[in-house]
Each structure stands twice: as C-alpha cells, then as structure tokens.
Curated annotation (Swiss-Prot):
Main location: virion
One example of a Gene Ontology biological process annotation: viral capsid assembly
Gene symbol of the encoding locus: TRX1
Organism: Human herpesvirus 7 (strain JI)
UniProt subcellular location: Virion; Host nucleus
Subunit structure: Interacts with TRX2, MCP and capsid vertex component 2/CVC2.
Cross-referenced InterPro entries: Herpes_1 (IPR004999)
Name of the protein described by the UniProt record: Triplex capsid protein 1
Amino acid sequence: MEMLQKRKHQTIDETSLNNLIENEKKKIKSLLAFGVPKECVLSRSFTPCELLGPERDHLGMLMFRLETDAESPKFLLISVLFLAMNAFNVSFCTRTSLANLYKTSLVDSINTMLDSCSYLEEKVSLFGVTNYISQGTNCLISCVMQGHVYDVRKENIYGLVILKDLLLEPDWEPRQNAIQYIYLCYIYRQAFNKIEYGIYIVLSELTHEEVLIDLLRNKFSKERFMFMNYLINGDGNLNYFGSLQRIGHCKTQNIKSGILDLQGISLTIIRLKDVFVELCERKIFL
C-alpha cells in the first residue's frame, strides 16, 4: 500500500494530448512523403561474365558465392538459375532451356566442382539479390544483403525473380496472411546410388523455422525415407537431410506471375515486388 502511494502518475491535459497527436501526424506524413527506407547493406564482387546469362539483363536475382579452393580466384558468383540446372525439382524442359543459356567451358568446370560436393552448402553460400551488374570481361556485381532492392539511384525497386519450378508453398492455406516470409531451402535425396539436391524458394506465413521444418519433413517424407535408408546403408559422412534459411519477406499482394523471355527461350517465373531482403542464419535438419 505504501508503494502504491509513492508511485507517481503523470496527468495529461488537453494541450499535451494534442501535441502528441500532432507529432504522430508529422511522423506519418514524413513516411508517406519519403516512402520505404532506402538504406540497405550491399555486397560487391567481380566475377567472369561468362558465368552470367539472364542475370545481366534482369536484376533482382539471388546470387551465391562459390568457393573454388583455388588460389585465384578464391570464389566466384553464380545465380540461382545456374544452380537450378542440376536440381532434381526442376523439370527436364526447364533444365534444358537453362543449359542453353549457359554454354562455356567455365560452366562445365563449375558443374564438375558442384558434383564433387556431398552438400551444396559446403561450397555455396548466399551473397544477396542483384541490384547492379556492370558489363565487360569481368562483371562487377552489387547485391543487397539487407534492405529493399533499389537500383543505384535509389529510384526503383527490382524485387525478387523466382523460377516457378523452384517455388514451394507448404502452408495448409497458402497466401492467406498479409505478409509472406521467403526462405531458401535445400533438400537432398538418394537416386542411382548418389545424392542429388533440390533447391526451393519457400513462401510461408510462418516465422518459426522449427514449425516450418516439420511441414517440410512431412512434405518430403518419401525423399527423407530414401535419404535415411542411404545413410544406414551407404555414406556415413552425411548428417542432415535439408537446410532452411530465411532471406526476406514481402506483402502477399505483391506476388505476381510472369514470363522471362531470354534469347528466344521463355521461362515461367514468379516476381516478388517490394521485397525486403534480410539474410538470416541457416538451419539444418534431419
């Protein structure tokens, strides 16, 4: 009782309340005038232009850093479309179309390097979403790691371009929430006595990775069973079935379908407008 008597209460009169309301109105007007925040965290690097296909003309692509284990260059940049060429969840027709877009000796060397990995994550890590690519023998690539994918003048937002074959929506009722969280997911399966990878861009309203991982286990129960069987009878060095990494979020209303026309080849895509990129920690699961 004594503590309650000592507690002080601030009284707000009509003038003070009106001042608070006016301050809030000014903040809202400021946000409406300048739009979404334009600050972002960028990563930049050079990479041979012969590793780039559609990425040069279409910004808003996921890029990955590939460790080469060589003295020079120590790493290269490749896109999600490059990785999709060998993913088991991509249709044969789409893989063939992508292979026609990447036809150099360096591409063959990179594919051989990727085939030697037990897990893709051993050599490949997320670099960001492209917002600028220069032209030349070696291209300077600028990627957004956190923030909206603005162009260099910060006038336009590119969003995120996703190959439709890679899209996965595991929610019971997809796109019912106003916000969709975007995840990068790798799934591994056993086929012809070897391990193959699948790469997915997952859209979900779930923010708790553990709950989403349970949904993915259920979704890929067949692949998981085959993988576990391979672990028991085969290579004991493998220790996880998949991985999940949140890469950003966007409004559900900004998810649009489209077509990407490239050198006479048409690819069905999903375009996520006004994406906020935020590369989080990767989680593995069995």
